[in-house]
Each structure stands twice: as C-alpha cells, then as structure tokens.
C-alpha cells in the first residue's frame, strides 16, 4: 500500500466530506436565482458559510468564497493595494508563491516592497518590522505574512504582527492555508484584516477556498460580474463545494505530535530539521540531507511507494531549490537537498517507521548520483 506523506500538497477527501459533497452535488439551482430551486441552493450555501465561519472564528458575512488559496491571496494583496492607494508592501521572501508572485506583479505596477529579514529558522525579524513601520507607516499599503510556513511548518507570531501594525493603522493579510485546523487560528481574535484558507489541505475538494475579510476592511475586487460575495468576488457560487469545505473545516485533525516526535527521532541521525527548535506545527517537517539531491531522494522514495515532496507543489511540477530555505540563508546545495514530509488523518506510526527504514539506503544512493 503506498505511503502518502505529502498532505501539505493536498490531502485526500475525508469520508465524511465525500458523503456530504456527493449529496450536495445533486442540488439543482443557482444560488442567485429567485425561484424555489435557487433559494434552496442559496439556503445550503449560506448554511455552509455559517458553519465555516464558526470553524474560522469569524462572522458569516466575513467569509468570501473563492476558487482556493491562490485566488484568496491575490484578492487580498491586490485588493488592499488598489483600495489604499499607497505604494509600500511589507512581506518576506519565505512566503508561498501565491503571495510572492502577486507582490512581484505589483512591483511592475509601481509598488515598492520591503522584504523583512528572516532568521535561519524561518521566523521574521520583529525588530525589522517595527523599524519599517515606524519610519514608513504612512506609505504602507499592507503587510502580508503567512501564519504557518507550508514548507517548514514554522509559525509566525501573527498576534504580535497585528498588534504592532494596529498602532499605525496598517492592514495585515495572512496566508492561513497551512495554519487553519493545524493550530489555534481564530480570525476574530487575530487582529488580521484578511486571511486566505483552502479546502483541499484539510481533506476537502480542490478548487474551493475562502478569503476571510474583516467587516472593517475594504478591498477592490479582482473579478467583475454579478456582484456575488459582498461584491468582492463575482461568479456563480458552488454550493456543493461550500458544503464540502464546511464539513472539512468542522472535522478535527488528529493530534500529530507523536508522529512528529517519532519522525524527528528517526530521521535526525540522517538529516537536519530545517526549523530547528523554533515552534512549528507538528504535521509539517522539513529536513535537509547533506550531499544529496532532494529530487533524487524523492524519486528513490517513490520507488518504495513513499510519497514526499521537496517543498511547495505550486511550482508547476518543476523541482528546484527551495526559495524558502534560500531566504533562510541556506546555500543552493543545501536548499536543493530538502525533503518535506507532511501528515494527514491516515498517517500512522508504521508509515513513519517505513520511511525511516527506507531512508538510509536512499540517502546513500542519492549521495552517489
């Protein structure tokens, strides 16, 4: 049986999600239609919105459904930038490409970016943030910082970031895709203006996500059309997708700490945990293996029916040195030697032991390639 340790790329549909999703797919009616079929679909959509809001810790009107995390991040960053009419964006080079590429696109449109310093464990330098806010808050359009890094699992102290930003009235967006459900992420208590989340990292369907937008936050929309989703995101809404997302969000994740402890214990003799002793979520672990190509190791493990990754899967299937590890100060060689393992509800201690059993030969072979 294949061992799947790449849940941070996508996590298989959970049984309860699949059951609810297939039932909801039989709905007839556009949620924007005023006839009874349309209103039935609207009722299902709004019930799902309310349930998702409860799981996120926000008001139902703050949930803006999107096609996933990438769209949600783009809507937040481009929407805040356009609405505020200021030039400076504050972010870090360790962000997901959905954030980095959106920010770099805005640079071509006249934005200026302050790239925050990042520690060797992948945590932003709060002194650097305090300094740039003090000196340039009047120019700042937004701050964009992920809550949990999708490659290393390192946690950003978001409440500290928002407390600092609030002094200067600068909105904070967070990519919450890797944090939601894997650590306490209550939007209402976070101080965030916007947060991106997605269903398929939680055992929901691919192609469905949300941007959580606080009531006080105004955005310029990316899409124009029928004015759905508080006029922030036009397009016919997918009621069945919303139901599936709500069920995935309501279904708790297992406690992965025992799996993480075993993985660190068994893999550390061969590789180095990239986040070191920095606090991180237990379901994402990244290791570097000196003298190895991570790509070679990935293929060798695949021959053992073990699926892992080099880092983010959102680089169009192209294996390359991790931009996250490069930003953390790793050499090109070290950043190319990384493997990420990530857990889901089906992951067992036996899976971790099987990985650890296969690794010594895989590492030895990879060093010869």
Predicted region positions:
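Pyridoxal 5′-phosphate
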Residues: 1-369
């Amino acid at each position: 049986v294949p061992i799947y340790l790449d849940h941070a790329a996508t996590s298989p549909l959970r049984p309860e999600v699949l059951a609810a999703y297939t039932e909801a797919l039989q709905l007839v009616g556009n949620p924007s239609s005023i006839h009874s079929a349309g209103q039935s679909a609207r009722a299902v959509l709004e019930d799902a919105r309310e349930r998702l809001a409860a799981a996120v810790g926000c008001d139902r009107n703050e949930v803006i459904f999107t096609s996933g995390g990438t769209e949600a991040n783009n809507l937040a960053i481009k929407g805040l930038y356009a609405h505020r009419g200021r030039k400076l964006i504050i972010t870090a080079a360790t962000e997901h490409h959905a954030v980095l590429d959106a920010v770099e696109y805005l640079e071509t449109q006249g934005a200026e970016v302050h790239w925050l310093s990042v520690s060797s464990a992948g945590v932003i330098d709060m002194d650097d943030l305090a300094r740039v806010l003090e000196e340039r808050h009047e120019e700042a359009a937004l701050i964009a910082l992920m809550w949990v890094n999708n490659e290393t699992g390192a946690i950003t102290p978001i409440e500290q970031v928002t407390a600092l930003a609030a002094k200067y009235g600068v909105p904070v967006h967070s990519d919450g895709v890797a944090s939601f459900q894997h650590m306490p992420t209550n939007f209402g208590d976070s101080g965030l203006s916007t947060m991106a989340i997605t269903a398929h990292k939680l055992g929901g369907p691919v192609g469905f996500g949300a941007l959580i937008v606080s009531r006080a936050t105004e955005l310029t929309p990316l899409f124009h059309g029928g004015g759905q989703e508080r006029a922030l995101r036009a397009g016919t809404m997918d009621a069945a997708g919303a139901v599936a997302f709500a069920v995935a969000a309501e279904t708790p994740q297992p406690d992965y700490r025992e799996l993480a402890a075993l993985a660190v214990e068994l893999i550390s003799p061969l590789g180095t945990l990239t986040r070191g002793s920095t606090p991180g979520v237990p379901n994402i672990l990244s290791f570097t293996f000196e003298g190895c190509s991570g790509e070679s190791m990935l293929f060798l493990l695949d021959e053992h029916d073990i699926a892992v990754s080099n880092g983010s899967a959102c680089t169009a299937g192209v294996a390359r040195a991790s931009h996250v590890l490069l930003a953390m100060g790793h050499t090109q060689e070290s950043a190319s030697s990384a493997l990420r393992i990530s857990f889901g509800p089906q992951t067992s201690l036996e899976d971790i032991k099987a990985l650890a059993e296969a690794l010594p030969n895989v590492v030895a072979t990879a060093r010869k390639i």
